[in-house]
Swiss-Prot record:
Disrupted gene: phenotype observed: Stay-green phenotype during dark-induced senescence.
The family this protein is said to belong to: Belongs to the staygreen family.
Species of the source: Oryza sativa subsp. japonica
GO biological process, alphabetically ordered: chlorophyll catabolic process
Keyword Plastid included in the entry's annotation: yes
Name of this chain's protein: Protein STAY-GREEN, chloroplastic
Induction: Up-regulated by abscisic acid and dark-induced senescence. Down-regulated by 6-benzyladenine. Circadian-regulation with an increased expression during the day and a peak at noon.
Keywords: Chloroplast, Membrane, Plastid, Transit peptide
Organelle targeting sequence: 1-48
Gene responsible for this protein: SGR
């Protein structure tokens, strides 16, 4: 997963909320559908984003490892830390998913993985009683080659993320069978980059909808909505915030995957960092 300086936007048919802060060092996008019947995530794709064809999840190509996690007990991630580490092999086209209490760093070793940086890591969080899945992708930084193709990597990651989310749900199927409400949890996607344009946080809506592929008829609407959104200053986006003190409604007490610009988000909302 990783290449043309084309990008895609989360643009709902009615409203889109964005927050630009610190000289465009961080962008928070939040979108919400108002059609309660369909409850689909309102995600549109610009026409040129179809260059590489549709992203399709194939369960037969997914290998799942449970590391330190009892697959049969299905502990709720709101009570016990639960993370996902997903890597992809360009040689075999297979995915490897590790389900653990922390990031499986052994899965990320080796010169090839350090050069490609095509892993996706995620963690479950409970904030003020609401579950959310926080997904992290490395776009650029740490290697000059990654900087040169940052736009392409951003596009590829966004295009493949529905496949990634489906892999999480399928690979951790027993957890979702026991706790189906987790599919309604909000998905937050963090794109890590040393380039302000691609260093951003996006809200992809409920997990159930975030893993759905874009509709074929969305391209034209996307282009118009993207152009209109660029002409006006967006409003502040929503951001999940922990309680200021110790509580039972927030877990875990600290992030297993720190977002290096959390202070920017806190400043943008005028709230102290947690």
């Amino acid at each position: 997963m990783a290449a043309a300086t084309s990008t895609m936007s989360l643009l709902p048919p009615i409203t889109q909320q964005q927050r630009w802060h610190a000289a465009d060092s961080l962008v928070v996008l939040a979108s919400r559908c108002h059609n309660s019947r369909r409850r689909r995530r309102c995600r549109y794709v610009v026409p040129r984003a179809r260059l590489f064809g549709p992203a399709i999840f194939e369960a037969s190509k997914l290998k799942v490892l449970f590391l330190g996690v009892d697959e049969e007990k299905h502990q709720h991630p709101g009570k016990l830390p639960r993370t996902y580490t997903l890597t992809h092999s360009d040689v075999t086209a297979r995915l490897t998913l590790a389900v653990s209490h922390t990031i499986n760093r052994a899965q990320l070793q080796g010169w090839y993985n350090k050069l490609q940086r095509d892993e996706v890591v995620a963690e479950w969080k409970k904030v003020q009683g609401h579950m959310s899945l926080h997904v992290h992708c490395h776009i650029s930084g740490g290697h000059v080659l990654l900087d040169l193709i940052a736009g392409l990597r951003y596009y590829i990651f966004r295009k493949e993320l529905p496949v990634v989310l489906k892999a999480f749900v399928h690979g951790d199927g027993n957890l979702f069978s026991r706790h189906p409400e987790l599919e309604e949890a909000t998905v937050w996607v963090y794109f890590h980059s040393n380039l302000p344009r691609f260093n951003r946080v996006e809200c992809w809506g409920p997990l159930r909808d975030a893993g759905a592929p874009p509709e074929e008829d969305d391209a034209v609407a996307a282009a118009a909505a993207e152009e209109a959104a660029a002409e006006q200053m967006p409003a502040a986006g929503e951001w999940p915030r922990r309680c200021p003190g110790q509580c039972d409604c927030c877990f875990p007490p600290y992030s297993l995957i720190p977002w290096p610009h959390q202070h920017d988000v806190a400043a943008a909302d005028g709230q102290p960092q947690q």
